[in-house]
UniProtKB/Swiss-Prot annotation:
Entry's localization field: Cytoplasm
Organism per entry: Escherichia coli (strain K12)
Gene Ontology BP annotations: chaperone-mediated protein complex assembly; nitrate assimilation
UniProt keywords, alphabetically: Chaperone, Cytoplasm, Nitrate assimilation
Superkingdom of origin: Bacteria
Protein name: Nitrate reductase molybdenum cofactor assembly chaperone NarJ
GO CC terms in record: cytoplasm
Family statement drawn from the similarity comment of this UniProt entry: Belongs to the NarJ/NarW family.
GO molecular function: metallochaperone activity; unfolded protein binding
């Protein structure tokens, strides 16, 4: 599915290659056989708007959206396992899937990075690729809702993936669930996370329990992302 390759490229950090190969991407969108006309048009508008931006501005926008906080992270398992030990095993299992299909990662790539997962799905037969999208549909809906809340044009990419997945997820209900969710990308929220990481570090070094408990209490209300249980259709 060439559409998955296109979205994968658009969800990667916008480097010089995006501008160099934009015409090829426009042509691939126009040749798509899996997108209704209106969806192909929306994808083309997204690409046009992105490539008319100054590259530095596009890169800053991307980093602010996807690299600050966890709520809009493109690491899939961040929204399922958080920092639990299950995440490591899930990574190993996904990496094994990639290797079975001949996809080799370099040492800097994480297997649950959404653009990489889409690239993997694009190599599969269409029916299997659609099933792979359905597997992550609750995460896609969550990311779409959070990006819409932030009035980001990137939300259109996640809505497009949900349509390709032909999923029955109610996006309006997902939006309602996160309506009152505190943002985790504010300076205050990021500072709280940094402070918490310092506590963990000092705890590992043998600090007294009472000091750690007192410090943690200060950040008991720090922003924490909601994690999904994908076995229940994405319910929190």
């Amino acid at each position: 599915m060439i559409e998955l390759v296109i979205v994968s490229r658009l969800l990667e950090y916008p480097d010089a290659a995006l501008w160099q190969h934009q015409q090829e991407m426009f042509e691939a969108i126009a040749a798509s056989k899996n997108l209704p006309k209106e969806d192909a048009h929306a994808l083309g508008i997204f690409l046009r708007d992105l490539t008319t931006m100054d590259p530095l501005d596009a890169q800053a926008q991307y980093s602010e959206l996807f690299d600050r906080g966890r709520a809009t992270s493109l690491l899939l398992f961040e929204h399922v396992h958080g920092e639990s030990r299950d995440r490591g095993q899930a990574m190993v299992d996904l990496l094994a899937q990639y290797e079975q299909h001949g996809l080799q990662l370099n040492s800097r790539e994480l297997p649950d990075h959404l653009p990489l997962y889409l690239e993997y799905l694009a190599q599969l037969p269409q029916s299997e690729a659609v099933e792979g999208l359905k597997d992550i549909a609750p995460i896609l809906a969550l990311l779409s809702a959070r990006l819409q809340q932030r009035e980001s044009r990137y939300a259109v990419l996640f809505d497009l993936l949900l349509k390709l997945a032909n999923t029955a997820i109610d996006s309006d209900k997902v939006a309602e669930k996160i309506a009152d969710e505190a943002r985790d990308d504010t300076p205050q929220a990021l500072d709280a996370v940094w402070e918490e990481e310092q506590v963990k570090f000092f705890a590992d070094k043998g600090c007294g329990d009472s000091a750690i408990t007192a410090h943690q209490r200060r950040f008991a209300g720090a922003v924490a992302p909601q994690y999904l249980n994908i076995t229940t259709g994405g319910q929190h």
